[in-house]
């Protein structure tokens, strides 16, 4: 087939869209409280990630949408496929066949397309792939995750060991991660043993590599809360014991946040501003003002939690805690300093930074606005991906488009060797 401008039409359109989206680029990492750009930390990408940047960007952003946005995107893709098949049929571009043959053909193709979509989603949840990491420019900043799980939690991915926990957090750029498995009577002893084994595998100095620290997720006053610094679910019950750092998690009923007494016992000292559960993404958006009001009125430190149970390969947010000289300290000592800072300085002790997420409808918006946000979820999601790309990612996308454009050249008879 001779080459023509039409052969390069779609690659040119794709390259133009990717390039134009760069004019409207979003900050790759922002302060979750103020929305301002982060000057002392940024995203880092491995060569493996950049080689497959288009797939990585789609999977990353799919990991950052709410539960309802997942539904809107999936339904939009199904409707788009159905409309495309109807248009092809009406325009005479499909092979002619009898009614029952057409029904069987379209049913089979539709089932295959839907299975392919589910397989794409499933790989994003279960499959291995390079991760986007955060790197801090200030050597005194510790990048922390306060909320994560292993297979010891009833809803943790089977086989998710402490070794896997280290690998995931290390790939995401964390320095320290609290393992906060759910406390149950059946698993208490096993969790304590696993925590001891994880601590034993920590480096001597925290700056050498990622360290795991103990914690628990327990039910307290009808709420799911995190207890930091100990794997003992009874910590702080006795008056003779110090009250540990307790963090209110989301999603939860935030009208029932446990409030401590004058001595600080019996309540929480912090609350999650960002949690990577899709339901929590929705709550943190819809109830953001309430979370901020709680943090202000109760003097709570706001934190981020990956809440990672073994599904997916993207971190939504990171905590930046300033601990001078932490790299030369023992990991447990760094943990104690962080916990002391959270108790003493509260809001000043921690800074949450996050990746940009697709805008969601807010509770005060009218039905028309909410319907518009649902109907346009798919195109807005595509544009959001393109505007959230960093320069290295955008160049990688353009490289793939260049390969796409070069493909017709490779197949062109004009470039094939001619017989003599």
Task: Outline where the language-model segments fall.
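Anion (oxyanion) recognition and catalysis
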Residues: 170, 206, 240-242, 292-296
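Metal-dependent catalytic neighborhoods of phosphoester/phosphodiester hydrolases
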Residues: 156, 184-200, 225, 259, ...
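Charged catalytic cores and adjacent phosphate/nucleic-acid-binding surfaces used
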Residues: 1-146, 163, 167, 221-231, ...
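N-terminal carbohydrate-binding/catalytic regions of secreted carbohydrate-active enzymes
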Residues: 153-155, 160-192
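Active-site mouth loops of central-metabolism enzymes
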Residues: 148-160, 247-253, 359, 363
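Active-site neighborhood of phospho(di)ester-bond hydrolases with catalytic His/Asp-centered motifs
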Residues: 143-150, 174-185, 211-217, 246-251, ...
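Short acidic, glycine/proline-enriched helix-loop-strand junctions
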Residues: 186-212, 291, 300
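Active-site/substrate-binding loop(s) of hydrolase catalytic cores
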Residues: 214-216, 222-236, 245-252
